[in-house]
């Protein structure tokens, strides 16, 4: 079984999936969402969960640097509750402080153009979040 990693934004949802052994995370795709209209890409997530045999979902939890919860962290908590209800799978909130920055640095180091970075940053951030979670399980 595999673990799904998600990086929730206001307009996009970064998606990553683990290998079957739960050792490595790969960025999968970025789903366009509209949180204001309540569109969280659940239909596409259902297809991914079924296709990859996902048994656990990890959602990035963007705490403030001092550990407190701001509006984005609270949005992630609501999203996690929605996922639990929709998919009946364990959902783990995982501290994602600086994950997008780490993904951005990796892409810059790989000499990826700014235009291409914009297209892949969310799925890369999801992969960073998921890899951190997977590493903690070893």
From Swiss-Prot:
Protein origin, superkingdom: Bacteria
InterPro entries from the UniProt entry: RNaseH-like_sf (IPR012337), YqgF (IPR005227), YqgF/RNaseH-like_dom (IPR006641), YqgF/RNaseH-like_dom_sf (IPR037027)
Subcellular location, record wording: Cytoplasm
Keyword set, alphabetical order: Cytoplasm, Hydrolase, Nuclease, Ribosome biogenesis
Keyword Transit peptide: no
A Pfam family it matches: RuvX
MF GO annotations: nuclease activity
Cytoplasm listed as a keyword: yes
Enzyme class: hydrolase
Cross-referenced SUPFAM superfamilies: Ribonuclease H-like
E.C. numbers: 3.1.-.-
Transmembrane parts of this sequence: none
GO biological process, one term: rRNA 5'-end processing
GO (cellular component) term, any one: cytosol
Family note: Belongs to the YqgF nuclease family.
Functional description taken from the UniProt entry: Could be a nuclease involved in processing of the 5'-end of pre-16S rRNA.
This protein's name: Putative pre-16S rRNA nuclease
Organism from which the protein derives: Geobacillus kaustophilus (strain HTA426)
